[in-house]
Amino acid sequence: MTAFTRFAHSRASWLILTGSAIALEAAALYFQYVMKLDPCVMCIYQRLAVFGILAAGLIGMTAPKYRIVRILGALGWAVSATWGLKLALALVDMQNNPSPFSTCSFLPEFPAWMPLHEWFPSVMLPTGMCTDVPWQFMGVTMAEWMVVAFSGYLVALLLFIVPILSGSNKPSLYK
């Protein structure tokens, strides 16, 4: 077993994934509450995608020696990062090509059985407009930085997918 595979089978790798998602969520709340930047609906959906990555990291951390746990974590990681990238690209398009016919809604469209914007309004209630660009760093908007972040998550997943799916030296169907 290579060092890379051992790392993919360790809690440390999943802890790094979880920690990076926590850092992004903390940054989002810093922008919202300290810098007073209002999140739009697409921003809220991207927050949810980051929470999905956080959940995937927690799943992987529970028992990373077992292949089934790593596969479930990787599946959550892939779905959340792909969905987040799709949302970030759509937001970049809205900001770069504003149109009165293509706008985002004022309220998120969560399922009726899970109205996150009502349960957690301080984190999941949008208050901004999607076409606003209130912040840039090095000439790159927040939406464009999220494209970088979600792309980074997908590149990391591509690097880790083979070691994640590989078994250990122990003879077992699940390891």
UniProtKB/Swiss-Prot annotation:
Keywords, comma-separated and alphabetical: Cell inner membrane, Cell membrane, Chaperone, Disulfide bond, Electron transport, Membrane, Oxidoreductase, Redox-active center, Transmembrane, Transmembrane helix, Transport
**A single BP term in Gene Ontology:** protein folding
Q: Does the keyword Transmembrane helix apply?
A: yes
Q: How does it sit in the membrane?
A: Multi-pass membrane protein
Give the chief site where it resides: membrane
> Superkingdom of the source?
Bacteria
**Compartments where located:** Cell inner membrane
User: Is this entry keyworded DNA-binding?
Assistant: no
Drop me one GO molecular function for this one: electron transfer activity
State which ranges are Cytoplasmic (membrane side): 1-13, 65-71, 164-175
Q: Which Pfam families match?
A: DsbB
Q: Which residues lie on this side of the membrane: Periplasmic?
A: 31-48, 90-144
Instruction: Tell me where the transmembrane regions lie.
Output: 14-30, 49-64, 72-89, 145-163
Task: Kindly indicate where the leader peptide sits in this chain.
Answer: none
List, alphabetically, the GO terms of the cellular component aspect. plasma membrane
Family to which the UniProt record says this protein belongs: Belongs to the DsbB family.
- Kindly give the PANTHER family that the UniProt entry links to this protein: DISULFIDE BOND FORMATION PROTEIN B (PTHR36570:SF2)
- What is the recorded name of this protein? Disulfide bond formation protein B
The scientific name of the source species is: Shewanella sp. (strain MR-4)
Lineage of the species this protein comes from: Bacteria, Pseudomonadati, Pseudomonadota, Gammaproteobacteria, Alteromonadales
Task: Tell me what gene encodes this.
Answer: dsbB
